[in-house]
């Protein structure tokens, strides 16, 4: 049985995401925390296989929380959730040891896939076995997530341009 700590100040997300784990091929117990401080106390008292944390919470930000977690438990994969990911944020998160960065809104299948891979990878490392999760598969996931983020950004830009064209056409006709 695997144990995951889910941290977010959004109570709706804390209630919704544990249901996603019921679809996992692994048996996963989920603990929740609504603040980074509460999570750090739980991490000291409980052995987790993976930690999933919102990036933007009151108190510690995602990078500060990541540093504290890695100092306490360097072997635990940490997945950050963010609603406003930038390339700069991603680079900093990976530099500090994040396993993955997932964009909100969360796709349940992608989320479950990333968490399950993190759990399996940790278990294999603990058993001293090689990791079949090649960098290529991880890179493919990263590319897919970045593609979704960029597609969303392009849709937003397209919508803004359409509104500006529509406004300009109205101005010309007046």
Positions of predicted regions on the chain:
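Two-component/phosphorelay signaling modules centered on CheY-like receiver
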Residues: 11-31
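Acidic, metal-coordinating helix/loop segments flanking the phosphotransfer/catalytic sites
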Residues: 32-50
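Acidic catalytic/metal-coordinating carboxylates
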Residues: 34-35, 61-64
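Receiver (REC) domain active-site loop signature in two-component systems and cognate sites
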Residues: 57
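C-terminal output helix
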Residues: 88, 106-115
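C-terminal output/effector regions of signal-responsive regulators
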Residues: 130-174
């Amino acid at each position: 049985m695997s144990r995951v700590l889910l941290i977010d100040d959004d109570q709706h997300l804390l209630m919704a995401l544990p249901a996603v784990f019921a679809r996992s091929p692994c048996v996963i117990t989920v603990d929740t925390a609504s603040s980074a401080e509460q999570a750090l106390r739980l991490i000291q008292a409980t052995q987790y296989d993976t930690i999933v944390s919102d990036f933007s919470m009151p108190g510690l930000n995602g990078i500060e929380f990541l540093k504290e977690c890695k100092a306490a438990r360097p072997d635990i994969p940490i997945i950050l959730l963010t609603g406003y990911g930038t390339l700069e944020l991603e680079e900093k998160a990976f530099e500090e040891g994040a396993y993955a960065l997932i964009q909100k809104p969360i796709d349940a299948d992608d989320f479950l896939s990333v968490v399950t891979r993190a759990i399996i990878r940790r278990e294999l490392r603990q058993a001293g076995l090689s990791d079949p999760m090649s960098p290529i598969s991880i890179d493919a996931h990263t590319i897919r997530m970045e593609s979704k983020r960029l597609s969303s950004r392009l849709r937003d830009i397209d919508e803004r341009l359409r509104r500006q064209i529509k406004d300009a056409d109205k101005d010309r006709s007046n």
